[in-house]
Amino acid sequence: MEHPILFLNLLFEKLGLHVVGPEQAKSFGDFLLQPHVTYTWVVMLVLLGLGSMAAKGLEMVPKGAQNFFEVVITGIEDFMISITGEEGRFVFPLIASLGMFILFSNYLGMIPGFFSPTANINTTAACALISVVFTHVIGIKFHGVKYIKHFMGPVWWLTPLIMPIEIIGHIARVLSLSIRLFGNVFGEELVLGILFFLAGFYLAPLPMMFLGLFTGFIQAFIFCLLSMMYFAGAIEHAH
């Protein structure tokens, strides 16, 4: 579900680039102009810009905003380590990057004329694949080839039964992460789009927008929390 008017689509039309719906997209160029792709670039540019500005203003003795954000980031990192253990500290940059990307993507669609990339299943599936694939990278990093024993069950003669169940379970993780995030953000986009269409950009959508601020944060938090738990499971099996 898209807002009635998307600014980037209008810009592309002015430049002579025709934006087609996902069903009509046939070429790679058509795919690159899809809203979930173009607004993903917007989110990435915003995050890169904020990161660059934050890096330039760093001081050895933190004060003001830097001090506040260092406390927040340290608290989040400590929370993650309480789940994954000290061995999982190295995955914090990935968790933080996924969390910031999902959070900003969730919030972007609340601005009239913009679209939430996470309201498209392709974006959420990509994030879920990163999380699940990296889970196995962690397992192999800590456990080597023996990590495959996790899929074989406690005794060898149960392998034909346990292995298919484990494989299905890991595929279900991708579906769970992607569909949960997509469904919640898409539902919010759907309601906002209807309210904007019926009542304009004024008071009617405000209650839903306040709810969207809360649910957008919760969905980003749940995605990161589940990813932490998957990473912790891979590290524990490595022990």
Swiss-Prot record:
GO molecular function, one term: proton-transporting ATP synthase activity, rotational mechanism
Keyword Ribosomal protein: no
Membrane topology: Multi-pass membrane protein
Pfam families assigned to the protein according to its UniProt record, in alphabetical order: ATP-synt_A (PF00119)
A cellular-component GO term for this protein: plasma membrane
TM helices/strands, residue ranges: 31-51, 91-111, 125-145, 151-171, 194-214, 215-235
InterPro entries, A to Z: ATP_syn_F0_a_bact/chloroplast, ATP_synth_F0_asu, ATP_synth_F0_asu_AS, F0_ATP_A_sf
Keyword Cell wall biogenesis/degradation: no
Localization, UniProt: Cell inner membrane
Annotated family: Belongs to the ATPase A chain family.
Function: Key component of the proton channel; it plays a direct role in the translocation of protons across the membrane.
PANTHER family: ATP SYNTHASE SUBUNIT A, CHLOROPLASTIC (PTHR42823:SF3)
Quaternary context: F-type ATPases have 2 components, CF(1) - the catalytic core - and CF(0) - the membrane proton channel. CF(1) has five subunits: alpha(3), beta(3), gamma(1), delta(1), epsilon(1). CF(0) has three main subunits: a(1), b(2) and c(9-12). The alpha and beta chains form an alternating ring which encloses part of the gamma chain. CF(1) is attached to CF(0) by a central stalk formed by the gamma and epsilon chains, while a peripheral stalk is formed by the delta and b chains.
Protein's recorded name: ATP synthase subunit a
Organism: Syntrophobacter fumaroxidans (strain DSM 10017 / MPOB)
Gene it is expressed from: atpB
